[in-house]
Amino acid sequence: MPSRYPGAVTQDWEPVVLHKSKQKSQDLRDPKAVNAALRNGVAVQTVKKFDAGSNKKGKSTAVPVINTKKLEEETEPAAMDRVKAEVRLMIQKARLEKKMSQADLAKQINERTQVVQEYENGKAVPNQAVLAKMEKVLGVKLRGKIGK
């Protein structure tokens, strides 16, 4: 039978040294391992985790923090902007021209029917992503120059 390798076949007789795998961090936290390290004089650092195991939300820097005292001192109510009347009327008009129900529109823009109802009733806080989806499906401008 011919060999796949041209020339003489040689053996690899160099020794292969197998090492034990490094200890995992879980094993290093074991009290036995910590006590053994202390007996050998190795420096051991122990750190207690802060709020470990609790279900508290961390403070995010992305969301602005509103001081409740400042809110109480303000005379103006902190109300969010709602959908303008002309926008909600354009949504209703364009939807009815296409002979779509609110559920059909909601299904096409991948939103709940309640979202479409809120936009048409003027109760929704304008979301650019939702308005863009509605513009695409209805074929009407709802942002900027409305109705064109």
Curated annotation (Swiss-Prot):
Coiled coil: none annotated. GO terms for cellular component: cytoplasm; nucleolus. Disruption phenotype: Plants are deficient in basal thermotolerance. It is found in: Nucleus, Nucleolus; Cytoplasm. One of its GO terms (biological process) is ethylene-activated signaling pathway. Keywords: Activator, Cytoplasm, DNA-binding, Nucleus, Transcription, Transcription regulation. Its main location: nucleus. Residues 102-121 bind DNA. Residues 91-145 form the HTH cro/C1-type domain. Induction: By abscisic acid, H(2)O(2), heat treatment, dehydration and high salt, but not by cold treatment, 2,4-D, ACC, methyl jasmonate or salicylic acid. It holds the Pfam family HTH_3. InterPro entries: Cro/C1-type_HTH, Lambda_DNA-bd_dom_sf, MBF1_N. GO terms for molecular function: DNA binding; DNA-binding transcription factor activity; transcription coactivator activity. Belongs to the MBF1 family. Transcriptional coactivator that stimulates transcriptional activity by bridging regulatory proteins and TBP, thereby recruiting TBP to promoters occupied by DNA-binding regulators. Involved in the tolerance to heat and osmotic stress by partially activating the ethylene-response signal transduction pathway. PANTHER family: ENDOTHELIAL DIFFERENTIATION-RELATED FACTOR 1, ENDOTHELIAL DIFFERENTIATION-RELATED FACTOR 1 MULTIPROTEIN BRIDGING FACTOR 1. This is Multiprotein-bridging factor 1c. It comes from Arabidopsis thaliana.
